[in-house]
Amino acid sequence: MHLLRTLLLRSNTSNISLLTKCSFRASPLHKWPISLRSGSQISLLPTEQKKWLHSQPKQQDTATKTPVHDLPSGIQHQSEETSPSARSSISTDPSSIAEEDPLQDQSIGLLKRFKKTFRQHGKVLIPVHLVTSSIWFGSFYYAAMQGVNVVPFLEYIGLPDGIVNILKNSQGGNALTAYAMYKIATPARYTVTLGGTSVSVKYLRKYGYLSTPPLVKDYFQDRMEETKELFTEKMEETRDIISGKMEETKDRISEKLQETKDRVAFRKKKNEDME
């Protein structure tokens, strides 16, 4: 009896397992998510063959944004504040920079400064240059009369032998020696001329004999105002001419319309009288 019961139980359990397997296979499968670990899933899809799809875990962004209030105080102040030099460079307007006087401009060479001063203050520079040049040449001529020999100095500074031989073998005497010294001292002469011109210009401006040149910004602004006024006047004249022509055309059209109306009314009246 015991053996029969055991056999019956085993047969029943095997039948039950077979039934469950068959029912599992026959039942429609939609989606069976199985959580293996955090962030990954295995899905069983209703297809003819079993496909196991692994969904990758969502990766978090490694680069996290730090809010502004979490930054250190030093970095936060540096990001919010702008350096004074940057502010000054931004706020600097090129039109506000005035043209520098060539007598005070040390950024250009001596010869360029001399030419620029000649173009701007030629009436003052020419007399100053003549006076200083006369003093320079007279001083060198007097030195040549006293026996000053400039030939060793010319050989020392490395001038060509042709120029040195001309001075050695020339019969010009003191005048040629003075002229050679005068040409050698050209940088010093130009410097003295510019200094004398600067002093003379300041003196003449102080006592009203020489007007102060306007700034470039003011000059261009005045020219722009003059051009604007001329343009406005021309526009007003053109507008008046156009408005006059339009009024004349309007009057002519009105006259023609009135004549046409009168003719039409006259014809209508005439036809009515005839009827």
Swiss-Prot record:
It comes from the Eukaryota. Residues 221-275 form a coiled coil. One of its GO terms (cellular component) is membrane. Residues 51-100 are annotated as: Disordered. Keywords: Coiled coil, Cytoplasm, Membrane, Mitochondrion, Transmembrane, Transmembrane helix. It is a single-pass membrane protein. It is found in: Membrane; Mitochondrion; Cytoplasm. Pfam families: FAM210A-B_dom. Residues 56-65, 75-95 have a biased composition (Polar residues). The chain crosses the membrane at residues 124-144. Residues 105-217 form the DUF1279 domain. Belongs to the FAM210 family. May play a role in the structure and strength of both muscle and bone. This is Protein FAM210A. It comes from Xenopus laevis. The gene is fam210a.
